[in-house]
Amino acid sequence: MILDNVNFPSDLKGLNMSQLKQLADELRLKTVNSVAQTGGHLGAGLGVVELSCALHYVFNAPYDRLIWDVGHQAYPHKILTGRKNQITTIRQANGLSGFTKRSESEYDPFGAGHSSTSISAALGMAVAKKGKKGRYNNIAVIGDGAMSAGMAFEALNNAGALDDKFYKNNRLIVILNDNDMSIAPPTGAFSNYLSRLASSKSYLKIRDFSKKLIHKLPNAIGKYPRKFEKAAKDWWMGGNIFEELGFYYIGVVDGHNLDVLVPILQNIRDNKSPDPILIHIATEKGRGYNDIIKSSDKLHAVAKFDPKTGEQFKSKSTRPSYSEVFGRKLSILAKNDKKIHAITAAMPSGTGLDIFAKEYPDRIFDVGIAEQHAVTFAAGMSCENIKPYVAIYSTFLQRAYDQIVHDVAIQKLPVRFCIDRAGFVGADGATHAGSFDIAYLINLPNFILMAPSNGQELVKMLNTSNQIDQNPCAIRYPRGECENNINYDDEEILEIGKAKIIKKGSEVAILSYGAILSNVIAAVEQLKQKNIAPTVVDMRFAKPFDKKLVNNLVKDHKVMITIEEGAIGGFGSILVNYLHDEGLVEKYNLRLRSLFMTDKFIDHDSQQNMQKKSNLDADSIVNIIEKLTK
């Protein structure tokens, strides 16, 4: 096994082409067997096995900077860069991250998790090296899906417009990994031949000589040779937007053919042309394993599985997820209300909107990885008396904050935000945790914020949201399952800002916001043994919250605790400010405590352990209440 002797990229340098191909086969098998034990993102990594081998064979990481966009596809890269023996700990507590991470390895020069950041980061690294001795390659590997985000094109536009002096001892190389063939198909052997020719030293030398000569000509004369060069290359290679943005374009290249990939990368490495380069490669997501596991999302994320049969070991549960409840109930509402439309940013199945899409394919819009556009697109729809429901993960909604403020809140447009994966998300760690949505929405005028404590409450809140026509509103709910026996025919509409008392008690009042209520209920059961019987309130609304109820509670309770699975600055902060502003803390000698996510980024772990690290689990709640009542 060649892979047994490969621990770092330097171990690849002495391999011949036959050995490199064998290494790729072994690396693919290692990736499959590793993910089979842990679950994780499989398809993207299998699609870049040959590319990973070629990049580490040709370039000199970490001296050369290699940045993987998103990071889903970085598993083979991790195996080749000193983490082979830890790969079966990926996405496990105290194990490797499922994404690239600077603190994990010097071979991960830039952390990822969200998409479309790689070109900007690589360009920043390239520009920062201006004037330094040596020659550096800064390589961004980005998928065609990530290219749908505006940020990627902002970076391309900036990179192509920069003066050549910024690239004197640097090279910016963008590798567009087209694994869905959504941009352009390769045209076979002739395309590969042209790509090798276009990257060759002789071609680029002639091109650079011509370029220098053209720049010395008067514009009136020089414009014709410039046009001729572009026209000639367009004829042979196919003109495209990347050339227009100032990149030298090579492609489309077979991303699984090392006989083609390696020479092209070597040509680029050895050439000193200052132009930024974009290499367009075609790969197959799930390469070598798609025929075993049949998956609509091309093995994007899988549970633990049998590597021989592809059977996934998913726990069988009859309980629906919050995402499923959302998708089903929205479909029911849409049956009687043709104004309802749904919007997702490349996550139809993750958000439950695949259910809606089956019923109403003409009333759902998947805008791609373009959260900013999604929000303003929804704002425009609402101007025309449509009811847009924007379903986005909490962590990705962060990317559209200016649009939420400027295009929705200020104009008081009734866009409905359905915020999935709110709170801790487990194995995907800090980059995907839904930590900040309460805090970044609660300070916006005109917004109504809701959070269900269970699946049936989500049904009621969707009913309620459909009746909110004068304000924007948001419903946040967690990753995971809710209770059985959801009554989807429930038509109850909640009174805006009205909380619900779950249990009447004395001395201690617990004000819970969202699904964290289940931990509160578990804590209250434990407190019975200690003769402590708190009042438990499901707040339902963080904005506006039930001030009348709060005012009554402070009169006959000595301790008030708020709890939410969100960052500091959320519901608890607003409530504490209110109580102090109204003078109620001093008047009733009230003891206050706000429980929320700890003020640090928590690495991947189980959702339960992450809650425990923030003192949001039942045992921690019990301990805190005991201390406050002594």
Regions found by a protein language model. Name each.
Residues 81-83, 89-121, 131-135, 162-298, ...:
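Thiamine diphosphate
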Residues 304-308, 442-487:
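Helix-enriched interaction subdomains in cytosolic or periplasmic regions
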Residues 29-131, 157:
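Long, structured ligand/cofactor-binding scaffold of large enzymes
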Residues 38-40, 64-67, 110-111, 133-149, ...:
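A short, small-residue-rich loop immediately preceding and capping a beta-strand
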Residues 138, 142-159, 352, 364, ...:
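Extended, hydrophobic alpha-helical segments in both membrane/secreted and soluble proteins
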Residues 36, 48-57, 121-126, 150-167, ...:
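Short alpha-helical segments and helix-capping/turn motifs at coil-helix boundaries
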Residues 1-79, 243-261, 275, 280-283:
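N-terminal amphipathic, basic-rich helices that act as targeting or association modules
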Residues 8-13, 32-40, 104-111, 246-251, ...:
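Glycine- and acidic
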